[in-house]
Amino acid sequence: MKKVSVLGSTGSVGKKTVDLLSKRKEEYQVEALSAHSNFALLAHQAKLLNAKYVAISDERLYKDLKESLLGTDVKIAIGATNVAAIPVDLSVVAIVGIAGLGPVMEVIESGTKVIALANKESIVCGGKLLLKKAKEKNVQIIPIDSEHNAIFQILQNDDKCVEKIILTASGGPFLNYSLEQLRNIMVDQALSHPTWNMGKKISVDSATMMNKALEIIEAHNLFNISPDKIEAVVHPESIVHGIVTYKDGFNFAVLAETDMAIPISYALSWPERLVLNYKLDLTKQGKLTFQEPDHKHFPVLKLSMEVLNSSTPQTNSIVLNAANEIAVNEFLKSRIGFLEIVEVVESTMESFGSYTDINSLSDIINIDCESRIIAHKIVESKVVAYS
């Protein structure tokens, strides 16, 4: 029986993971679960999966969680890092944002040998530091993002003579919108993705295509591939998740339905495969289309390449991610407009001036904090100007 932990179990990916695990209790023993604030769902999941440990990040909800688990033997902690330190066979990390970086590092140190990673920000910001530590500890990182999961599967079979990798993007809900239409986007519109069912933050990132920008940086770090060998194409049907082009002209692609249960199950069962009832019928799909991204409407893809080709790519990656997290949060509060998300990111990167060597987790956190302060000031200036 495989021992598993799920960090971020109440988010969209976490809930999918819990659902899969609940149907295979004879194969998986869930040691630990963690959540940010949804104590009621966390308690329900703990009972459902007979988890031994749970952690809540918002310490104000500790008593509520404790009351919800009265009569059980579940041990309760505050903060995901406390349960991340529990060694398991496989840890699923589905925490949103850079908040997942510390727990990922803790999992690597714990003795856990496989990490199923849905937290792209830890790879984007942790970069070489995180991956070096994983290599030292002999930890296998399996990406859950469907695009990187696809590339991972292909490269598992053949990682030599790679010409380029292609990450597909749905284009989000505003693919064919004019700039004037984009200027007037409301929050509920940005949360309505045409092909994927996702959380709020990643839905907005998909709408701005920042999700793909972060994935380009993630692919560079995760697969150690030069930026000039990474390409993004718009594929509205979202059936082809990733393509690897080899030097002899052959292209290998991974195709699957648009359900996160598929890459999650791959990560849970690796190096084996689970039996799932997701059968792709291309005759019913009808057509698969691809097109170049519109960089005028969605400038963040070029921004990610500028980051990777800069003299300080890791620092700039951290700044990019931090500013985006602040901007998306302010957009979700309706304090800034849709197009202003990218404006805040660009202005933050232009204003950031502290470049230091990154040798520790604290170095990353310091850059992240400074970037957030700058981004907040830029947001406030826009709010004042708007009002």
From Swiss-Prot:
Catalysed transformations (reactions): 2-C-methyl-D-erythritol 4-phosphate + NADP(+) = 1-deoxy-D-xylulose 5-phosphate + NADPH + H(+)
UniProt cross-references to InterPro entries, sorted A to Z: DXP_reductoisomerase (IPR003821), DXP_reductoisomerase_C (IPR013644), DXP_reductoisomerase_N (IPR013512), DXPR_C (IPR026877), DXPR_C_sf (IPR036169), NAD(P)-bd_dom_sf (IPR036291)
Pathway the protein contributes to: Isoprenoid biosynthesis; isopentenyl diphosphate biosynthesis via DXP pathway; isopentenyl diphosphate from 1-deoxy-D-xylulose 5-phosphate: step 1/6
UniProt-annotated binding residues for NADPH: 10-13, 38, 119, 121, 199
Chain positions recorded as 1-deoxy-D-xylulose 5-phosphate binding sites: 120, 146-147, 170, 193, 206, 211-212, 215
Cofactor: Mg(2+); Mn(2+)
Biological function: Catalyzes the NADPH-dependent rearrangement and reduction of 1-deoxy-D-xylulose-5-phosphate (DXP) to 2-C-methyl-D-erythritol 4-phosphate (MEP).
Protein name: 1-deoxy-D-xylulose 5-phosphate reductoisomerase
Annotated source species: Wolbachia sp. subsp. Drosophila simulans (strain wRi)
Gene: dxr
